[in-house]
Structures are given as C-alpha cells and as structure tokens.
UniProtKB/Swiss-Prot annotation:
<keyword id="KW-0053">Apoptosis</keyword>
<dbReference type="GO" id="GO:0033650">
    <property type="term" value="C:host cell mitochondrion"/>
</dbReference>
<dbReference type="InterPro" id="IPR000236">
    <property type="entry name" value="Transactivation_prot_X"/>
</dbReference>
<keyword id="KW-1079">Host G2/M cell cycle arrest by virus</keyword>
<comment type="subunit">
    <text>May form homodimer. May interact with host CEBPA, CFLAR, CREB1, DDB1, E4F1, HBXIP, HSPD1/HSP60, NFKBIA, POLR2E and SMAD4. Interacts with host SMC5-SMC6 complex and induces its degradation. Interacts with host TRPC4AP; leading to prevent ubiquitination of TRPC4AP. Interacts with host PLSCR1; this interaction promotes ubiquitination and degradation of HBx and impairs HBx-mediated cell proliferation.</text>
</comment>
<keyword id="KW-1045">Host mitochondrion</keyword>
<comment type="similarity">
    <text>Belongs to the orthohepadnavirus protein X family.</text>
</comment>
<dbReference type="GO" id="GO:0019079">
    <property type="term" value="P:viral genome replication"/>
</dbReference>
<keyword id="KW-0804">Transcription</keyword>
<comment type="function">
    <text>Multifunctional protein that plays a role in silencing host antiviral defenses and promoting viral transcription. Does not seem to be essential for HBV infection. May be directly involved in development of cirrhosis and liver cancer (hepatocellular carcinoma). Most of cytosolic activities involve modulation of cytosolic calcium. The effect on apoptosis is controversial depending on the cell types in which the studies have been conducted. May induce apoptosis by localizing in mitochondria and causing loss of mitochondrial membrane potential.</text>
</comment>
<keyword id="KW-1035">Host cytoplasm</keyword>
<dbReference type="GO" id="GO:0039592">
    <property type="term" value="P:symbiont-mediated arrest of host cell cycle during G2/M transition"/>
</dbReference>
<keyword id="KW-0945">Host-virus interaction</keyword>
<keyword id="KW-1121">Modulation of host cell cycle by virus</keyword>
<keyword id="KW-0805">Transcription regulation</keyword>
<dbReference type="Pfam" id="PF00739">
    <property type="entry name" value="X"/>
</dbReference>
<keyword id="KW-0010">Activator</keyword>
Amino acid sequence: MAARLYCQLDSSRDVLCLRPVGAESRGRPFSGPLGTLSSPSPSAVSSDHGAHLSLRGLPVCAFSSAGPCALRFTSARCMATTVNAHQILPKVLHKRTLGLPAMSTTDLEAYFKDCLFKDWEELGEEIRLKVFVLGGCRHKLVCAPSSCNFFTSA
C-alpha cells in the first residue's frame, strides 16, 4: 500500500525527510485531474513523529529522524517515475544510510530541481503541492541496489 508523502530536505541534519499527508489535512484545496488535493496543515504534517497520523503501509524508517532508506518518487498526477529511471537516488540514499560518502544535501537539492521538479514546472504544476509515493525500502527488501530492484511496486 502506498502513502502520500511530501519530500523536504533538512539541511541542518543533512537528511532527506518525508512529511506524511494526513487525512485530516484542512489546507487550501487544489483541484486537478485526480480530484481535489489539500495542502497539509501544521497539525497534519509533523517532523517529530507521525504515529498520530494513523497512516498504514509505511515502513518503520518513514518517521525516522534520519529519513527513509530509499524512496521511489512518483508524480501523483501522472504516475510517471522520473528519479527512479536514472537509479541515482536509491544508490545515494543507500550509501548515506551506511555512512559512506555520497551526494551532499546541496547536490541533492540541485538534483531534485533539475531532474524532478523541472518537468512538473513545465506542466504548470505548483511545487508546493507536489505529492510523492513511497514504494519500498530496505525494511521491505533485503538486498543491495546493484543486485536487485531496490523498490517494491507502489
């Protein structure tokens, strides 16, 4: 089961964080081809702990202060995976979880802007309303990125 999540880079901790979108979100609604989406309210999106959000299907690392192990980012509107096609992000995050040298937070941010948000911006979508899908991580699959598909299907 996939869950809707917002992605945020935390430069103070040099980690990539997910912000779960709770069903109780009462932000400004956004109408699109998939229906009405709401931006998260402060109470619905917490950086501390997400147990109160009652989301199902998230791996144990989703609410970790270190961020998730690996992500599969998908445009919720067109379901087109852009980052996973290059196989860069899963390898980078895998190295970071092992404490190995990897892409810096600044480089990750540039990567997201260049490879992920660019296409969506050209389609006229608002970055602040981007919704992502978490597909899987090392808590679901026990293998190395080089020997298997790092993600489960969302």
